[in-house]
Structure formats: structure tokens, C-alpha cells
Amino acid sequence: MYSFNGYSQEQLGIRMDNYTGMDQAWVNPAFVAASPLSFDVHLVGFGLFVEQNYGFIHNTSLLDMKKKAPNFVSAFDLDGKAAPKGHLVGDVYDSPNKKFVKFSGTLTGPSLMFKVAEQHSIGVFTNMRSAFTATKIPSVLGYYSYDNQAYKEGFTISPFKAAGAIWNETGIHYGFEIEKSNGTIAFGANLKYNSFLESGFFGLQKEMTYTKISSDSVSIDYPAVEFAITTGNINKFSFDSNTKNATIGQPSVDFYGHGFSADLGASIQIEDNGVDGYRWRAGVSVLDFGIANIKQKAEFHSSYPIPNELTLDFDDLKTAKTVKELERKISQLALGDPNASLKATSFKMGLPSAISIQGDYQFIQHLYVGGTIIQPFGLSRYNLTRTAVLAVAPRFENRYFSLTTPIILRDWKSARMGLAGRLGFISFGTDNLGSFIRKKDFTGTDFYFAIRLNAINLPNFLSGGGRKRNKHSKLGCYGF
């Protein structure tokens, strides 16, 4: 059995659903132990999350883009003229706001969960994950702001960081549920072994003064810069600035680092006679607690000791045909030695760690309102940064069908509405419904899709039915 499944950001539209099996483990592994399902097998799925505030596509949505693609023109080429009918117009923002770029995605391989003696959940899973975050990028580095800076007049650039990685995680899940007189208490854990393909980070540690000398050269005062990168594939890339020809060698799929991580969670459910299942549920969890150790084909560079001034001639830098040559040239200019910037052949970076608090209340049979808070934190100097989330998600749910409308506040300032559903063994949704249907400046999107098999009896599809405590064994398999 081979499969994949993609997760776009937090996928709150389906992860609070009691009948999505291992999907619940990614927000709180204790929820799996308290699940009404006897077993859950993921088959296929896909997901993606991307959001940024550097550029945009004018007045469009994903559905509109599907009609107009591939007719695309940039605002620079139009030079103030109206775009041809049926064309998409790309542009960049000219605003004083700091910039950010965020991307995440996951491909899940064989994933299985089953119950033992009703109170114990056991699972195995593999995920291929990718993430990139760049935050607090100074607005002066925006295209228009930078272009409008006068020559020979210095301006300041404040500190910012960026980090990215592609990695595989192989893990096991275990959870157990303790029955009380009026409900249950559950605990769960996902233990993961991570293998990293590509990763790296960049950081400007201190404020620096940047001066445009000409269109081809700049001067930088006190550039306190650090960066790290895996070199297995990037060293196979070369570029000739004269001929504009790029050469890319045969890419390799190798692991350059490893590490362990864990998701830990606990939950409590209170039941009453008014509804099947629980009346309310609360949980707390720690997610992606771990560090990546990159030790093979890895480089960590630093400008320390910080030079008083660094002058870069872009015409000279263009003669470098590989990333390695470019690194050596800048090191020679900044530190007087082409090898001085290379401080180590290994580096560490934190995974997208976060603490999460969840709540869920069943008002009447099958009608719930759930809430989730996710607050990221870092374990290292450089980290893959998760997005802070505050979400409220009303939903209708039974064994065979669910509909959820999450309202999500990201990073405590950007509100979005989502829509998600489950029809038997198919789950689908988005945490950014507006990107699909609302014409506006398009800056990113979010969607997810999954197919699974679990203990549901299809002949009873329309009869609904709620969860009965300690009745896992009576939830039948799919019937065909």
C-alpha cells in the first residue's frame, strides 16, 4: 500500500473532526486515542499553503486565473497602460509594511492507525514535508522602495531572518484513554525520526547602513550576516551572465542531516445524557518539538569579525559562475580571505515548534463549535517558523458527513474564512476560501484534500448516527 497526503498549514477544517483518524494527530495526538474509529488508513491526498505580501496579481481569484492562464503580463511592461482583455497582471506592493513569505506543504506516505482493547491507539506514518519562512523583511527592500533610494545617500536595513527545509519524517504514534465516571482523559504522542534533504537559513544580525553608489555597486557598513546551506545540489548549478545560459547537473536525492522530534498531547472529554459522544472537549499539545542537525555537505558562513565597510561591485560578482565562486568572492572582499567566511561544515536549525490549545463544544446532537490557538516558539537561533493562529470553527459532524466553516486569525492580524467537508472517506477544504471565489489582489492560497478508509458502514450512510463511548468495535468497515 503506497499513498500520499498533503497538509497545508494547519488544516483546521478537518483536524478538529472526530472521524478523520490520523489527521487529528497533527493538532493533538491525544485526540486519536479518544477517536471513535477502530482503525484509519490514509490512501491519497494533496495540500498546499503559500502567503506573502511582496507581490500580487491584480483583481483575480484561483477560479478566475484558471480561465485566463497562461495570459500574463507584468505591470512594469504595461507602464501605466491598460492590460489586454483576459490577461492577468502581476505587480509588487509599494507600502511601508515589513515583508514576509510563508510556504508549507506535506506529502504523507503509508499511514495507519488502529485501536487495541478500545483504549489504546497505535499508528505508523511517513511524511515528506517542506517549509520556508522569511519574516520582518524591511520594507526598504521592496522593489519600488529600493529603486527610489537616492544614490550615495545611505539608508538603514533592520535585522531579519529566513529559513527553509525539505525533510522526511518516519514516525510512530501511541495514545491511551482513561475512562472516568463522566468522561475520559487521553494522552498521546507522535515520535518522529527526521531525515533532511535540503535546508538552509539566512540572518542579518544587526542593523546596517546600505548605500547605492551606482547602478552596479553598493557600500555596506557593518554587515553582520550569517547564512547556512546544504550544497549537494546547489553546487551542481552554474550560470554564465554573459551568455545568460544556466547549467543544472543531475539532481540527487540524498539526506544531509537527521534528528528526532515529537508531538505530545493531552485531552479531557466531558459527557452527559443530552448528546451522544462528549458535551465538551479540551486539549493541549506541543507540536514539532525538535532540532535538525545538518552534518553532511553543509556550510555555515558568517561575516564575523564584522568589517567596517564592504563594497560590492556587481559586474565583478557576475563573473562568478557557481554559488561556491560567489561565496569565495564575497568572503575575499569582506574578510580579505576567500575561505574566511566558512566557519563550519555543519549547522542546526529548529523545527516549526508550537504549543496549541484546543476546545470543542457540542451544542446539540452533531452540531459543534471548536476553537484552536497555535503559538509558535523557537528552539534554536534559526527556526522554521510556524504561523500563529487563533481559530473558531463551527461544524456539523456525524460518522459519514461533516461541514466546517473555520474563521482564522493568522499572526493576530490577518483574518480569513475557510470551508471544509468530509463525505464518507473523502476530506477536502481550504482555510482561505476567498482566494478561490473572491476577486481581489491575489497574494496566496491554501487547500487540502485526502482520501482514507476507516471503520464506517456505507449502507448506513444516510442514517447519521453519533458516537457511543466504548462502542468503537461497533463501527463497521466500509461496505461495497
Model segments located where?
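Subset of outer-membrane beta-barrel
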Residues: 9-480
